[in-house]
Curated annotation (Swiss-Prot):
Gene3D superfamilies: Hotdog Thioesterase. It comes from Thermoplasma acidophilum (strain ATCC 25905 / DSM 1728 / JCM 9062 / NBRC 15155 / AMRC-C165). Its EC number is 3.1.2.-. Belongs to the thioesterase PaaI family. InterPro entries: ACOT13, HotDog_dom_sf, PAAI_dom, Thioestr_dom. The lineage of its organism: Archaea, Methanobacteriati, Thermoplasmatota, Thermoplasmata, Thermoplasmatales. This is Putative esterase Ta0293.
Amino acid sequence: MFDGEDLKKIFAMDGFLRNIEFEVSYISEGSIEIKVPLKENLMRVGDIMNGGAIMAISDAIGGLTVMTYGSVINQVTVNFNTEFIRPIGTGPVIFRSSMVRIGKNIAYVDVAAIDGNGQLCSKSMGTYYIYR
C-alpha cells in the first residue's frame, strides 16, 4: 500500500516538488490530504499563494492519488483544469484529493485547496493515464 513515506520519497525525487514543505494528514485508497505551510517560495506579489504553485501541488497530489491503487505502477497527466475561487493568503493550505473514477487506463481525480481559514480557494480536476 502506498503510504506517507512513499509520498515524501516521490516529492524528494522531483526537482520542483522537493522544495515544497508538507505534512501528510492521511492517505487511503483513492484519497490524500496534505498540509502545506505558506512559505516565501510559494508566494507572489500581493502576499498570496502563486497560482502555478497551487496547480503544481494539486496536480502532484492528484497523480499520487492514482498511485494509491495497488495495481498502478505510475501515471502521467493527460489534462488538468483549475478554477481559482479566492486568493490564498493564510495557511497552512490543505490539499485534499478524491478519486472520481478509475478505469483500466484513465483515472479522474478532484483536488480542493483550502486556506488556513477553512475556505475553499481552488478546485481542480485531473485526468491521468495509468501504467499498470
